[in-house]
């Protein structure tokens, strides 16, 4: 059960960091 908690926290942290960097910088994909 603890493994699922660690995976959930790790995924959540990565998603938060990804969205923070993506929304902070202007998206270069959509011209």
Curated annotation (Swiss-Prot):
GO biological-process terms attached to the record: photosynthesis
Localization in the cell: Plastid, Chloroplast thylakoid membrane
Topology of the protein relative to the lipid bilayer: Single-pass membrane protein
Disulfide bridge partners, by residue number: none
Alphabetized PANTHER family for the sequence: PHOTOSYSTEM II REACTION CENTER PROTEIN T (PTHR36411:SF2), PTHR36411
Oligomeric form and interacting partners: PSII is composed of 1 copy each of membrane proteins PsbA, PsbB, PsbC, PsbD, PsbE, PsbF, PsbH, PsbI, PsbJ, PsbK, PsbL, PsbM, PsbT, PsbX, PsbY, PsbZ, Psb30/Ycf12, at least 3 peripheral proteins of the oxygen-evolving complex and a large number of cofactors. It forms dimeric complexes.
Name recorded for this polypeptide: Photosystem II reaction center protein T
Native source species: Porphyra purpurea
């Amino acid at each position: 059960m603890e493994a699922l908690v660690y995976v959930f926290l790790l995924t959540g942290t990565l998603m938060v960091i990804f969205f923070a960097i993506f929304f902070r910088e202007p998206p270069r994909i959509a011209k």
